[in-house]
């Protein structure tokens, strides 16, 4: 990305943006202050282009203490999402019997070929063919991805990437366990013929989460 664009990294306590900002990318946010959330809120309400990446279980997150797993590998932007009418369960990961990768995993001392349901190889109908950003892609790989639901009839959430109908939601921490048996997750995949939105555009007018906020 830095080869094509001028990228400026900002820390989690920032409350103002560079005036030259064209696009705001919010990646795996946690513990953001109200001042920072207010800045994001106002940027979006003024029409600022924004890409938000949330993760129910960041497998590659680096722990602050070497050798100890991260205490909280989940993203959280609930204050804004709740106002917008978008639900993201930060404790649930998408499990997919159709798009799941076939892998070899050592289980009880034996190497076994299994479908790893949280590791998604999304293709075909899972990719919105009318979406220009996907025009040159035939497949997208995601691991322990979350899902988004619009629970507000006034908010349009247009799917970009979806699971297959042979999918469900399961415990993200259990799904992200590199030593676990993926077959134990199968009970969470129930035949509801329902796709889950893994990525989407919000194409509606949004309301502020800070009606009476004072800086």
State where each predicted segment sits.
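Acidic, S/T/G-rich, low-cysteine, solvent-exposed domains in lumenal/extracellular/periplasmic regions
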Residues: 1-215
